[in-house]
Amino acid sequence: MSQLVCQRCGKCCNDLVQQDRGVLRGLSLMPEEVHLFPEELVKPYLGIGKRPHMDKFQIIAYQLVSDSCPHLVDNSCSRYDERPTSCRQFPFSLDLDEENEPLLGVDMNCPAAVELINNTDGLLEFTDRDDAERLLELKRRVLENPRRAWVYDLATMKWVRFDKMG
């Protein structure tokens, strides 16, 4: 079974703020990971509820607003053992296919992923699948009721209802 060997290029820790379906968003953070970053670098990301300003509105994920991770030092993570879920799963990710079944994605901007895919025996070791499953669960919650799911747009600093996104 082939295993990913990080090449410490730092590409995964830069260009973290991207356009996604018409909104500008940063690296996803689980609520318990917010403390890993300075408060001014974290904003809400996903919320569930009728309206963001209402009492029962629940923020289910946050996002890093910095384009580069502040923990990247000499192309290495200075907080590797406690890095966020999004970082743990990288360069792999899980998404949902047409039948709502998990589909494995691989970020081919990662040189280690390219090397792994080019030299694989057909089986990949996905050691942090549990982390990818946690992020996939957020997607499932959003897709269960897209009219009650909201995404915080970093460009406008406003909430956008998920079903209204591009």
Each language-model region and where it sits:
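Short loop/turn segments that flank or connect secondary-structure elements
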Residues: M1-G166
